[in-house]
From Swiss-Prot:
Descriptive protein name: Photosystem I assembly protein Ycf4
Family according to the record: Belongs to the Ycf4 family.
Lineage: Bacteria, Bacillati, Cyanobacteriota, Cyanophyceae, Synechococcales
Keywords annotated in UniProt: Membrane, Photosynthesis, Thylakoid, Transmembrane, Transmembrane helix
Domain of life of the native organism: Bacteria
Role, per record: Seems to be required for the assembly of the photosystem I complex.
GO terms for biological process, alphabetical: photosynthesis
Record GO cellular component, one term: photosystem I
Location(s) in or outside the cell: Cellular thylakoid membrane
Residue spans crossing the bilayer: 32-54, 69-91
Gene name linked to the record: ycf4
Membrane topology, as annotated: Multi-pass membrane protein
Length: 193
């Protein structure tokens, strides 16, 4: 779940001037499993609905032709269509690797470049490194937990730079935040709720 760091190497000492952080996108095992389950379930519900409408068994399991079309077969058809559309959407996100990208801290140019793949186009944000005041770790526990690394910027909202998904382990989050703060020579702000 953690982002991979790599320091560029060239004849000059670029580890002091360039830091790249690769951010993983939507190509995760859990997304493949959910998209596959939705596809199978959606097709199954649609076939059960068609079986109840035409009175023939289109599924090898059960006996869906005995279902009354209104309301059981009709609702199964709606659920099947909805699940199939959501599955197609998830497969599209997986195909383009939505959310993947690169955080590139370049001291030579004095620019932080944050690039992410969107559904239809790539998003690129460039910020002067001098505008970065601190690296901030945000941790929120509870029903909807959030663990992420953000950059506190001068005159702007905080910019999240860690990957989206399940919460990262705290140790990994702290190590990544410390690596960035050390590279930028700024403060690492604590865990805020």
């Amino acid at each position: 779940m953690s982002a991979d760091f790599k320091e560029a190497s060239s004849p000059t000492d670029s580890s002091e001037t360039l830091l790249e952080q690769i951010v993983k996108g939507s190509r995760k095992t859990s997304n493949y499993i959910v998209a596959s389950m939705l596809a199978v379930g959606g097709i199954g519900f649609s076939l059960a609905s068609l079986s109840s409408y035409f009175g023939i068994d289109l599924l090898p399991l059960g006996n869906p032709s005995t279902l009354i079309f209104v309301p059981q077969g009709l609702f199964m058809g709606f659920y099947g269509i909805a699940a199939t559309f959501i599955s197609v959407y998830l497969w599209a996100l997986i195909k383009v690797d939505y959310g993947s990208g690169l955080n590139r801290f370049d001291k030579n140019k004095g620019v932080l470049s944050v690039s992410r793949k969107g559904l239809l186009k790539e998003i690129l944000v460039e910020i002067p490194i001098d505008d970065i005041q601190a690296v901030k770790l945000e941790v929120r526990e509870g029903f909807n937990p959030r663990r992420r690394i953000t950059l506190r910027l001068q005159g702007r909202r905080d910019l999240p730079i860690s990957e989206v998904g399940g919460p990262q382990p705290l140790l990994s989050l702290e190590q990544e935040g410390a690596e960035i703060a050390r590279f930028l020579k700024v403060n690492l702000e604590g865990l805020s709720n």
